[in-house]
Amino acid sequence: MKRLLIPLLAFLTLPNAVHSSHLYNQRELIVTSESTKESIELAKYVIVKGVVKYSAYWCPNCLNQSELFGKQAYKELNVVECARDGINSKTQLCMDKNIKGFPTWEINGKLILGVLSLKELSKLTGFKK
């Protein structure tokens, strides 16, 4: 019984290990949720307003923030990758801006740390539906 149980447990944990390794090796956030019409409009609006999201691919809060937008809207955002080993990393810019945590939003020259709901982001940027 023990001989069967140990390989079985190893096999059952393998997909999670492969999945985690795969995401880690991506070096970028992988957003899977679908966008709404409103989230796409908001993303396009914040680009025009010069809003920047400072992020790190390995940051769970950054992924949570990005999932609120969905994958289509996320592609519209001005996202600066701060992780040194991230794809298109701009670590020096993040250091120059004194980014202390992720995600950090730059709105009207002000840095705001943390996950913002789409409603909060709309209010802070003046977005109207």
Regions found by a protein language model. Give the residues of each.
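Local sequence-structure signature of Cys/Sec-based thiol-disulfide redox active-site neighborhoods
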Residues: 35-76
